[in-house]
A protein has these predicted regions:
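Compositionally biased terminal segments of proteins
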Residues: 1-140
Length: 140
């Protein structure tokens, strides 16, 4: 994605007042940028529940896990977040008014497929709804 396309997407996301729509757009953009660098991300946690309930449950952040065992080098994360004007350290940032957390490798033995959802800035992968709900119960 070109710097111009990223800047345009960022401007659109920042001007989006609906928090669910903003989170979906930002998730798509982040997923696309990491995919360009070879890292497949999956939306997990409260943000997965938020997307499934169409905002009926609001988590306040976007949680990602990676699908591969290969760790994402910190420099790659920093470069991508810097392109988005994000602020933060290690694996947690404030980007376009939303907190984004990179939690590590996706740990699941589920055979259920992830749900794919198209956004204006890329396709996001979301853990199955059953896993999202179980996860919320376990961590509540």
């Amino acid at each position: 994605m070109t710097d111009e396309a990223i800047a345009s997407a960022k401007s659109d996301i920042e001007s989006t007042t609906d928090l669910l729509e903003r989170a979906l757009k930002l998730s798509g953009l982040i997923t696309s940028l990491f995919a360009e660098r070879g890292f497949k991300l999956v939306v997990v946690g409260g943000s997965a529940v938020e997307f499934y309930t169409e905002g009926g449950y609001m988590s306040g952040d976007i949680d990602f896990c990676r699908k591969t065992l290969n760790a994402i080098p910190p420099r790659v994360m920093q470069e991508i977040v810097a392109k988005l004007g994000g602020k933060g350290v290690a694996r947690s940032w404030l980007v376009c008014g939303l907190y984004v957390d990179m939690l590590g490798v996706l740990e699941t033995e589920s055979t259920k497929p992830n749900r794919e959802l198209e956004t204006p800035y890329g396709t996001i992968s979301i853990i199955p709804p059953e896993l999202a709900l179980v996860e919320r119960v376990l961590f509540a």
